[in-house]
Design a protein with these regions (language model features):
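Conformationally flexible catalytic loops at phosphate/diphosphate-handling active centers
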Residues: 160-238
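Glycine-rich beta-alpha junction loops
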Residues: 105-107, 167-174, 252-254, 305, ...
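Generic long, charged, amphipathic alpha-helical segments
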Residues: 258-291
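Conserved thiamine diphosphate
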Residues: 114-168
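Thiamine diphosphate
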Residues: 1-126, 133, 141, 328, ...
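Peripheral docking tails and interdomain loops at the edges
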Residues: 302-350
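Glycine-/acidic-rich phosphate or pyrophosphate-binding loops and their flanking alpha/beta elements
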Residues: 6-10, 223-246, 259
């Protein structure tokens, strides 16, 4: 079924297709429509929506529902996610599945409500305390806002871990075609949940391990599942990279601008390609390294002062030059702006 839909609303429709049965959150621009849509749609299928008194309360409600075996989610933006970080660390430490949507806005501090990509470090590098990882998915369209949210629930259950849908505010606020295909949600049986089973006692779920050896073993087990995710879950998209001399790298709304840059640059005689990471963690390092090595030059474009570029440089490992171009404050570089940047940089290397 095709419909015109806002990105934030598409998140909730994707969650419903995944069998989400609880949403706890607190409204914040530019993510508020997710809570509004959840309040409208979840009760219609017998699911729970609750607006908490704060983001701290919301993430701890998510912890409780996840421990009970419910497919549960929350959504927020910048400052709200900062308040949730302790709870996210607890959820990861207790190995509980949940989905968290971050519709990024400008920062630091209160910043503004305009879109940015400045939460990359906070979400991709963990954000909270301790040795844990978030699986992070980066949609670039309204369609992917729905599809990657559905996928997020499956990955959360597969790895018993928080999964972040990291969207810039442009993708959250834009409206475009959404093609929804009904699927029967089949969440796995959760024998580990606090309710246990008729044949077993109830389970105790916690993230505290008082004995050093117990905590170390717990962290080894967590690292083993993260290693499995690195091997099985990297996702990315390449566009016209086979003969490219310059490789553009961007995610979210930036990747859509860069696709147009590729076409415009090629009309001007520059062989340019695009690499779009879809999983920001696990980062598609091997595929990016191969594409970058073929090209010889890399330009990373972000709506930040340079965050993902650090992972790009780690992936390339000094094999080729990696340069950066960024805009902040809610400004998105135009196709003409990036093409001019490419032309200027190409002239400097002649």
């Amino acid at each position: 079924m095709q419909q015109l839909c806002k990105g934030n609303v598409a998140v909730v429709k994707g969650a419903l297709l995944a069998g989400c049965r609880a949403f706890y959150g607190y409204p914040i621009t530019p993510a508020s429509e997710i809570a509004e849509a959840a309040a409208l749609f979840l009760p219609q299928v017998g699911a729970t929506f609750l607006q908490a008194e704060s983001e701290v309360a919301a993430i701890n409600m998510v912890y409780g529902a996840a421990a009970a075996g419910v497919r549960v989610m929350t959504a927020s933006s910048g400052p709200g996610l900062s308040l949730m970080q302790e709870g996210i660390s607890y959820i990861a430490g207790a190995e509980l599945p949940c989905v968290i949507v971050d519709v990024m806005r400008g920062g630091p501090g209160l910043g503004n409500i305009a879109p940015e990509q400045s939460d990359y470090f906070a979400m991709v590098k963990g954000g909270g305390h301790g040795n844990y990882r978030n699986i992070v998915l980066a949609p670039a369209s309204v369609q992917e806002m729905s599809e990657l949210t559905t996928l997020a629930f499956d990955l959360a259950d597969k790895y018993r871990n928080p999964v972040i849908v990291l969207a810039d505010g442009f993708v959250g606020q834009m409206m475009e075609k959404l093609d929804l295909t009904y699927r029967e949600a089949t969440p796995p049986e959760k024998l580990w949940a606090v309710k246990g089973t008729p044949e077993t006692r109830k389970n105790l779920i916690s993230s505290i391990f008082l004995e050093p050896d117990e905590l170390e073993e717990h962290q080894r087990q967590m690292e083993a599942k993260y290693a499995r995710a690195r091997n099985e879950e990297t996702r990315y998209e390449e566009y016209r990279t086979d003969d490219a001399d310059v490789l553009l790298v961007g995610y979210g709304i930036v990747s859509r601008v860069l696709r147009s840059v590729v076409e415009e640059a090629r009309r001007k005689g520059l062989r340019v390609g695009l690499f779009r990471p879809i999983t920001l963690w696990p980062f598609p390092s091997n595929a990016l390294s191969q594409a970058a090595t073929r090209a010889g030059k890399v330009l990373v474009v972000e709506l930040s002062n340079g965050q993902m570029v650090e992972d790009v440089r780690l992936a390339v490992n000094g094999k080729v030059s990696v340069e950066f171009y960024g805009r902040t404050g809610g400004n998105v570089p135009s196709v003409e702006e990036i093409c001019a940047e490419l032309t200027a940089r190409a002239a400097l290397t002649v």
